[in-house]
Each structure stands twice: as structure tokens, then as C-alpha cells.
């Protein structure tokens, strides 16, 4: 019964650019292509950037300028949780009368988990609650900025060279006699719009400005390394003052060795992204723009369109002995769905993981439509489907339990069975051309899914 909640034991095959096997809850369904889609066969588009702490929304250009970090929120350098701003009162001397003191509010950063504070590293308190926190300066900033400018100029030069070579290849392929014979010579000799090869030869990176080539000094290897202190191997080590590997990797520009060198880092921004089908370029998932909203404008998850198979009970599986496995089929749509199960044909390229022989019900299965109110209505009259008790174990609302027979074909290892599931689907997507008056109702199409079940290990 515990296998009923283990959806990762039932995999569906996605026939995309690359064959992917994944649970139905991790897949999408394109209503225009009528095919399953995985995260590897969709296009990812960034809709917006936002801070997960203060939920500030910002455009992509601003996020790039801020290096994809929030300007107001910080992460604890010790445990990586969000830092909070604490207020305290400190006594300060009056500028008019130094002998007298007055209470003044001061703010500092503190972590509620590991008790780290900005005072531990000597950061001065601030008189305002947000902004203005001291940040350590990277000694290699100038060198890195110089390298970035140099390679940007180099990339621009290479782009100009590529454009020059492309225009040099565009030459007249028709012979001069042929063009003169049919009166095309004058037409071909007319000046063409756009830049010619001669004008392109004098192209510069910035037209109208003096080009100053950026030169950088090559890095030089150091022959002599600074020796270690004499007491490096003999002095006792206090592990509470030594940073962990994760703490050092979170600050690669400083690589702090001691806990006293840990400074807070600006919090990374998160994104809201849209997913688009690569084949038809329709949206499969599109969230709302507001960071506080968890709703979606478009969310074509496969569990809302494709019948879901789950394993309800697994008997003791033994080599070359037939066992009966109970599965559940769930209809996610509101109309009746007809499902037919059949075994994979011999030599099927998709049937590569099967280790057991499976016998599925030969009859067509009818699943009732999804009705949320009927699940809680005990007085509702059940529909009469005239089920065969040898095939149907139970039926409740839009769920039905069916029996399949499994015979393991290998003496050891995991038991995996594969079969095909054919079902009808009413395509409710908006058609490209308007439906003619003679067409009645929505289009019904038949889809076939490849399903793999992981039934666990064999018993001796």
C-alpha cells in the first residue's frame, strides 16, 4: 500500500529530442502537439527576477547590473540563512556638551540560527535600518575589470572580421556574357544598398571615435612562494575559528581562513520562468508576474490531462512464477475516458528495461469523469459500468483498480514491466482555423503512452 504514494516507481516515456523516462508529476503536456514534454525538451525563459526575502521585483537589466543580488538583504556567512536587522540603543556624547550623553538607536545584522552578528567581524553599526553596510574590497577588482574590457574588445574585433569575410564571399555567380545577353549587366552594375566591401574594410569598432587599443600585462608566475610561519605546525588549532570548505567556496573572491574574516554576502535573486514547447513554441507554464503570487497563468502539467497509473499492492515476486499486481488508474479530466492496455511488441525499441512478462486486461476500461463534489457525496448513485470482477478490483469516483499478471524472467535483480496505454483525449485547445458549422463538439484524438513499473526486488 505504501507504493501508492511512490509516484517515482511509475515512469512515462517522453518521445522528444532525447528519450526521457520520468514520473507523470514531473512532465508537461502540450495541447497543441498532443505530446508529453519533459524539462529537457522545452525552452526556458526568464520572466522576472526577485529577492526571496524582501520580494523586491526588478527587471533583467537592473538584476544584471547588481550581479543578480539584492541590495538590501544579506545571507549569514556562517550558516547561509537570511540575516535580520536588529536595533539597539547606544549612548553617544552630545556635540555641544561632551560631558553629557544621550541614547541613540543603532542597527546591526544578526543571524537567528547561529547567533552570528556583524559586530563579530568589526562592522560598525548604522544609524539607518537599511543600506550602507561596509563591504570588503577585492584587491583583484582592477585586474578583473581590465581583463573583461580587453576580452570585450577582442570579441568585437572578431565579430567585425567575421562580417567582413561573409561579405567577401558574396560575389556574382553569373558570367558576364550571360548577363549582357539578357540585358542584366546594367542591373547588376547598379549600386546596391548597404555597405560595400571597400567601405567595410575601413570599419572600426567605434565609428567617429579614436580607437584606443586596450593592452594588458600577462600574468607572471611567482618563482618564490611566501614561506609558512614557523609555528604553523606546532600551534594549537581552534576549530571554532577555522572556516569550513563550504564557507570558503561561498566567498571565492576572498577565501576566508578564519571566522573573523567572514563578511555577509548579498542575497542571491530568484527567478520566475516560463516553459515553452520547442516544437510549436506555445507556453506550457507561465507564472504570474507578482513575486507574492504562487498562481500560474498557464500550467499544462501532465497529471491534469493524462490518466495516471499507480501501484497499489505488490505480492511476493518469485522467478518464473505468475503473480497478480493491483494497479490504480485515475482519470484527471471531467469527461469519460476510455483506456486500453496492451503489451509491448517483440523488438519494440522502447522496451529496453523490461525484466518480466506482463499480461494486461484485454478489455477496454472506462473511467468516470472527475467530479470533486461526488467524492464527498455518500448518497450519490454510482454509475453502472458492468465491471468484470476478474479484471476490476474496485471502482470509486474517477479511480479504478485493475489486476495485471506479472511473471519475472530473471533470477535476480529488480523486476520491471512495461506496457502501452492507449486512451482518448478531447483537445480543448483553441484551433488555428475556426471550426466550421458542420463540426459538432470538440476533437477527440487517441494517444498512446509507454509506461514502466518498478515492482521491486525478487524474493528467493
From Swiss-Prot:
Sites of Phosphoserine modification: 196
Residues bearing PTM N-acetylalanine: 2
Modified residue annotations for Phosphothreonine: 407
Effect of residue 76 to S: Loss of ATP7B-binding
Primary subcellular site in the record, as a coarse category: cytoplasm
Keyword line: Acetylation, Coiled coil, Cytoplasm, Cytoskeleton, Isopeptide bond, Phosphoprotein, Ubl conjugation
Effect noted on mutating residue 79 to S: Loss of ATP7B-binding
The keyword Acetylation belongs to this UniProt entry's keyword annotation: yes
Coiled coil: 152-172
Gene Ontology, cellular component aspect: cell cortex; centrosome; cytoplasm; cytoplasmic dynein complex; cytosol; dynactin complex; focal adhesion; kinetochore
Effect on the protein upon substituting residue 73 to S: Loss of ATP7B-binding
Family: Belongs to the dynactin subunit 4 family.
Protein name: Dynactin subunit 4
The species this protein was found in: Homo sapiens
